[in-house]
C-alpha cells in the first residue's frame, strides 16, 4: 500500500514510440514495414491522455502510416501533451523542443494545446497545434504535412480493438470526456470542457472487443467516472438488444457480466457511489474504489469547491467496509492548500488515522496557471508545505504498512505483469497498474504476463508484498475468497 509524493520529474507519465526517452511499443505493436509515411509518437500525462493517443495511432495505422521507434526514422512526430500543473507544462514544452531538435517536424495535441500562444512563443516552428481529444483534426494535420500512404496490406491486420499502448492483458476504458465540477485547484474543465458521456452501447461494444482480444482487466476512467450519464439525463441506450441506462451502476452491472476484472478510477464521491458497493461484494466488479477526497477539513473543502466532510466520509467508509469487507480504497489529498492552518492539517492527519485508507497519493499544493485557488489569501510557505507533506507521508506510511502486513498468511489471486531475473511480478485485485503496489513471486519463472495464479503472502512492507505460489492452483474453492475472481 503506497503513499505517493509529488515529484515534478514524474508528474506527467511519458509514453512514447520513440527510443528517446522510452520505447513502449513492442515489436508486434510497431509495424516498421517500411511502407508509407512514418510517424513517431510521444504521449504525456494521465491514462485519459493515453487513450486519446491510442485512438490517434489506431486511425493512422488503419490509414497505412507506419509507427516507428526513433526520431531519426520518423518523417513527423506527434506530441500529445499534458497541461494539468506547471511541472507538466514544463515537461510538455521540453518534449516538444526535444522533438523539434531531433526531428524538426512536430504536431502538438492534448491539453496544453489550448495554450497555443504559449507554445508558439517558445516553439514557433511546430507544424500544427490542436486541443485535447481532437482526433480527427490531428489526423487531418498529418494528411496536410505527410502524403497519405498507398494501401498498406499490413494495415488490414489492425485488430478491432485498435492500437493499445498498455500490456495485452489490461486496457483503459474511457467512458466520458470533460467535467462539470469547478474545483478551485483544477483547470481540466477549461481544457477538456464539460462532461460528455459516451453512449452506453458504444462503451460496452468496446469492452466486449477488448475482452475478445485477450484483455483480462478493464480500468474504467474519465475525468469524473461517477457522473457518467448526467449530461444526457441517464437516457436509455441499447446493447445486445436490451435497454441499458447511461448510468454508472447499470454500466458496471453489464461490465460485470463479462467475466473479467473491472476496476473503477476517478470516482467522485456522489451519494450513488454507495450503490456500487454491493456489486463489488458480489464479485461483479473489483472491490477497489479510487475516490479522491482531497482533504478532511470542512472549511478547506469549501475553499476547494469539494463536497463532504470528515464525519460524513468516515460514516460512508465504515458502511462500505461493512457491506464489502474486502474493499480497498485509494484516495488523493492536497496538503498546504492556501489558507490551511496547522489545526486544519492536524484534522487531516486525524482523519487518516481513523479512515485507515489502503492507498493514498499526497501532493503539496502547487499553483496552476488559471486555477482560481491561486487568488485565495494566506498561501502556505513552501517549507511548511513540504514539512506537512513529510508528516502526512509518515502517518499514512505506517497505516499502509500495517494494512499490508495484515495480509500475511492469506491467499490471493495474482495477475502476472512481468517476469524478470528475480522471478514473476504481479498484482492482486487491490493493486492498480502503475500507481499501486506489486506482488513479488521470487523464483517463479514458468508464467507469462496475463496469467493468473494463486499465491500466499509471506512478507510485506509499506509498498509491496512478497508471496509464494499456493500448492493447489486448480481448486478455487480451497482458496480464500478475499481475492477477486
UniProtKB/Swiss-Prot annotation:
Keywords in alphabetical order: 4Fe-4S, Cytoplasm, Iron, Iron-sulfur, Metal-binding, S-adenosyl-L-methionine, Transferase
Entry note: cofactor: Binds 2 [4Fe-4S] clusters. One cluster is coordinated with 3 cysteines and an exchangeable S-adenosyl-L-methionine.
Cofactor: [4Fe-4S] cluster
Residue ranges occupied by any Radical SAM core domain in the UniProt entry: 165-402
Classification via CDD domains: Radical_SAM
Catalytic activity: L-aspartate(89)-[ribosomal protein uS12]-hydrogen + (sulfur carrier)-SH + AH2 + 2 S-adenosyl-L-methionine = 3-methylsulfanyl-L-aspartate(89)-[ribosomal protein uS12]-hydrogen + (sulfur carrier)-H + 5'-deoxyadenosine + L-methionine + A + S-adenosyl-L-homocysteine + 2 H(+)
Highest taxon of the lineage: Bacteria
Record GO cellular component, one term: cytosol
UniProt domain TRAM: residue ranges: 405-471
PROSITE patterns for this protein: MTTASE_N, MTTASE_RADICAL, RADICAL_SAM, TRAM
UniProt EC number: 2.8.4.4
Gene Ontology BP annotations: tRNA modification
Matches recorded under SMART domains: Elp3 (SM00729)
Residues where [4Fe-4S] cluster 2 binds: 179, 183, 186
Coiled coil (residue ranges): none
Record domain MTTase N-terminal: where: 37-147
Matching PANTHER family: RIBOSOMAL PROTEIN S12 METHYLTHIOTRANSFERASE RIMO, RIBOSOMAL PROTEIN US12 METHYLTHIOTRANSFERASE RIMO
Known function: Catalyzes the methylthiolation of an aspartic acid residue of ribosomal protein uS12.
NCBIfam families per record: 30S ribosomal protein S12 methylthiotransferase RimO, MiaB/RimO family radical SAM methylthiotransferase
Family (UniProt): Belongs to the methylthiotransferase family. RimO subfamily.
Protein name (record): Ribosomal protein uS12 methylthiotransferase RimO
Organism: Alteromonas mediterranea (strain DSM 17117 / CIP 110805 / LMG 28347 / Deep ecotype)
Lineage: Bacteria, Pseudomonadati, Pseudomonadota, Gammaproteobacteria, Alteromonadales
Gene transcribed to yield this protein: rimO
Amino acid at each position: 500500500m503506497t503513499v505517493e509524493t509529488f515529484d515534478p520529474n514524474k508528474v506527467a507519465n511519458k509514453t512514447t514510440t520513440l527510443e528517446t526517452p522510452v520505447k513502449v511499443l513492442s515489436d508486434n505493436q510497431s509495424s516498421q514495414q517500411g511502407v508509407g509515411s512514418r510517424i513517431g509518437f510521444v504521449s504525456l500525462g494521465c491514462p485519459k491522455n493515453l487513450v486519446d493517443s491510442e485512438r490517434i495511432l489506431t486511425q493512422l495505422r488503419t490509414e497505412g502510416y507506419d509507427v516507428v521507434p526513433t526520431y531519426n526514422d520518423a518523417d513527423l512526430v506527434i506530441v500529445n501533451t499534458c497541461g494539468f500543473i506547471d511541472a507538466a507544462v514544463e515537461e510538455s514544452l521540453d518534449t516538444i523542443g526535444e522533438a523539434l531538435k531531433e526531428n524538426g517536424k512536430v504536431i502538438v495535441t492534448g491539453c496544453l494545446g489550448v495554450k497555443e500562444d504559449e507554445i508558439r512563443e517558445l516553439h514557433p516552428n511546430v507544424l500544427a497545434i490542436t486541443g485535447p481529444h481532437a482526433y480527427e483534426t490531428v489526423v487531418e494535420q498529418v494528411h496536410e504535412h505527410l502524403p497519405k500512404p498507398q494501401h498498406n496490406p499490413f494495415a488490414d491486420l489492425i485488430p478491432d480493438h485498435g492500437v493499445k499502448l498498455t500490456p495485452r492483458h489490461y486496457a483503459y476504458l474511457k467512458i466520458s470526456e470533460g467535467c462539470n465540477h469547478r474545483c478551485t485547484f483544477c483547470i481540466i474543465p477549461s481544457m477538456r470542457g464539460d462532461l460528455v458521456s459516451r453512449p452506453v452501447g458504444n462503451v460496452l461494444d468496446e469492452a466486449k472487443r477488448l475482452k475478445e482480444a485477450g484483455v483480462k482487466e478493464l480500468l474504467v476512467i474519465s475525468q469524473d467516472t461517477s457522473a457518467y450519464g448526467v449530461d444526457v439525463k441517464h437516457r436509455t441506450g441499447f446493447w445486445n438488444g436490451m435497454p441499458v441506462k447511461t448510468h454508472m451502476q447499470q454500466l458496471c452491472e453489464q461490465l460485470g457480466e463479462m467475466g473479467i476484472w473491472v476496476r473503477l478510477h476517478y470516482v467522485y464521491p456522489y451519494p450513488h457511489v454507495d450503490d456500487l458497493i454491493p456489486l463489488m461484494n458480489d464479485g461483479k466488479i473489483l472491490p477497489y474504489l479510487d475516490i479522491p477526497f482531497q482533504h478532511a477539513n470542512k472549511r478547506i473543502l469549501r475553499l476547494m469547491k469539494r463536497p463532504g466532510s470528515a464525519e460524513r466520509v468516515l460514516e460512508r467508509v465504515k458502511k462500505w467496509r461493512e457491506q464489502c469487507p474486502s474493499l480497498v480504497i485509494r484516495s488523493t489529498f492536497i496538503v498546504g492548500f492556501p489558507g490551511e492552518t496547522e489545526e486544519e492539517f492536524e484534522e487531516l492527519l486525524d482523519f487518516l488515522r481513523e479512515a485507515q485508507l489502503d492507498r493514498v497519493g499526497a501532493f503539496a499544493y502547487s499553483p496552476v496557471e488559471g486555477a482560481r485557488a491561486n487568488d485565495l489569501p494566506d498561501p502556505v510557505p513552501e517549507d511548511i508545505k513540504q514539512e506537512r507533506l513529510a508528516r502526512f507521508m509518515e502517518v499514512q506510511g505506517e497505516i499502509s504498512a500495517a494494512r499490508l502486513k495484515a495480509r500475511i498468511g492469506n491467499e490471493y489471486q495474482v495477475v502476472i505483469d512481468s517476469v524478470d531475473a528475480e522471478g514473476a511480478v504481479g498484482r492482486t485485485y487491490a493493486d492498480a497498474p502503475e500507481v499501486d503496489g506489486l506482488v513479488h513471486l521470487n523464483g517463479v519463472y514458468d508464467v507469462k504476463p496475463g496469467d493468473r495464479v494463486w499465491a500466499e503472502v509471506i512478507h510485506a512492507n509499506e509498498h509491496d508484498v512478497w508471496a509464494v505460489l499456493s500448492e493447489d492452483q486448480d481448486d478455487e474453492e480451497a482458496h480464500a475468497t478475499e481475492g477477486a475472481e
